Amino acid sequence: MIPGEVITPEGDIELNVDRPTLKVSVANTGDRPIQVGSHFHFAEANDALQFDRGLTKGYRLNIAAGTAVRFEPGQSRDVELVALSGKRQVYGFAGRVMGALD
């Protein structure tokens, strides 16, 4: 083994297995691009993004950690979200929850 080396098993690594997911259509109604990161509480994303915020409470993008999705001005796209896990508490972001989700 080389110092710092990471040895993984053969094959693909599946993310978020058996976690609730949902697909939502999102439109950027603003005049600037908007990026949403992998672990951002999606319901609190930029207000220029139009989608059902109530439906997305407690969800984040179902993408690899450290990545983001970019919404260009006027663009609409469908994204897949995955339920937050752990304690299911949300603090910060846009300050709209500041506590337990459930």
Curated annotation (Swiss-Prot):
Enzyme class, first EC level, given as a word: hydrolase
Main location: cytoplasm
One Pfam family from the record: Urease_beta
Pathway it works in: Nitrogen metabolism; urea degradation; CO(2) and NH(3) from urea (urease route): step 1/1
One GO process term, biological-process aspect: urea catabolic process
CDD domains cross-referenced by the UniProt entry: Urease_beta (cd00407)
CC terms in the record's Gene Ontology section: urease complex
Record's keyword terms, sorted: Cytoplasm, Hydrolase
InterPro entries listed in its UniProt record: Urease_beta-like, Urease_betasu_sf, Urease_subunit
GO terms of molecular function: urease activity
Catalytic activity of the protein: urea + 2 H2O + H(+) = hydrogencarbonate + 2 NH4(+)
Entry's localization field: Cytoplasm
Entry EC number(s): 3.5.1.5
Assembly, per entry: Heterotrimer of UreA (gamma), UreB (beta) and UreC (alpha) subunits. Three heterotrimers associate to form the active enzyme.
Family designation: Belongs to the urease beta subunit family.
PANTHER family: UREASE (PTHR33569:SF1)
Record-given protein name: Urease subunit beta
Species of provenance: Acinetobacter baylyi (strain ATCC 33305 / BD413 / ADP1)
Name of the gene: ureB
